[in-house]
Amino acid sequence: MLPIRVRKELQRLGLDLQSQSLIPQTGLSGAEVYRVGNYAIKSHPLASFDRLAILHRQQQRWAQCVQGWIPRLQAWPSLLSSPAPTVLVAELDAPLLQRPAADSLYSCWECMDWLPGIHSETIQEVTPGQQTSVAHALGTLHALAQQAPSPPNGSRDDRMTERNRLLQELLQSNFQQPYRDLDRLATQPIPLDLLDSIPNTLRSAKQIALDCHRAMLKLASQNNTRHWMHGDAWRGNWLFDADGVSGLIDFSQADLRWPGFDLARALGSMIQGPMQAWIDPWESYCQALSDRGLQPAFRLDEAYVMHRVSSVLTLARYLGEHHLFVAPNSPSINRLREVCQQLIDR
């Protein structure tokens, strides 16, 4: 349920709270989002207040420069004169006996445009036109970010450093933990064809890790180019109208990062096959930057390496999180199947 304070703010915006849209809609990421009229209402932990305020300023800048497919944030009526008018802190509206611990009595709430369109649930549903449209949209987003003030020289992307560390640990241990996790995973209700494919997938993942670890080490140690990016540009966060992009949602992972992450995350979740299949979208990405007098801050092969490394690490993580597969129809089963297919089709 929406907290009382959030309800009052929405009423002040003239929204009807009696509609069925107050039922939370669970996205592919697991986050609950309420649709009220033409707005999306989403909660965050109280501890994320300062970060949300920073993210909102960047998202507002993108929304002002890109009309239509970046959701605009709505200022809460009672906060119009505050430094962070788009971040509302509200106490949870729950019976006393059902209340959580004191440190989670409050949460942050944001209100933004509800964008139209549909998303692709599987990689097979994505069309070549959608792949190209997404790449062009990312190029537009990154061009705007490059034109913003740069972070201090010598800064590093912690996400890249962490991926490199995890990859090196897998190689040094000869993938021992994933193989042990596979034995325990056999007790979960996973389709037999998928379970039988995992040993072959692990062999392929190990070879990919061996092939990519030097390139990954170089990226982690030498690349210090960072600018604002979406941070989780996988296919579930893109909305489409036919082949065109109609929306990019969920900016909660936006940050100053190496920009190749966005393209790796997006195309890696939309294209199955070798790097050659990425060339047309890559050219569209480059064109969006060129239209603004800019060039990519990374090479296509670097983004592809990041995708391959991320796929290996995703497989290892999924094998170790057995709770994701306790339900026979868990979405994680489809995600595991997709990762296995990507690692085998190399």
Regions found by a protein language model. Name each.
Residues 63, 142-149, 271, 289, ...:
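Protein kinase-like catalytic domain
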Residues 294-307:
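All-alpha amphipathic helical-bundle segments outside canonical DNA-binding/catalytic cores
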Residues 1-19:
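Juxta-kinase regulatory segment immediately upstream of eukaryotic protein kinase catalytic domains
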Residues 124-199, 226:
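A cross-family kinase active-site recognition segment
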Residues 43-107, 123-133:
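A conserved alpha-helical element in kinase catalytic cores
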Residues 26-37, 41, 210-261:
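Active-site acidic catalytic loop and adjacent metal/ATP-binding pocket
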Residues 259-293, 308-327:
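Active-site activation/catalytic loop segments of kinase-like enzymes and analogous catalytic loops
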Residues 105, 109-124, 187, 309-327:
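A glycine-centered beta->alpha junction motif in the catalytic cores
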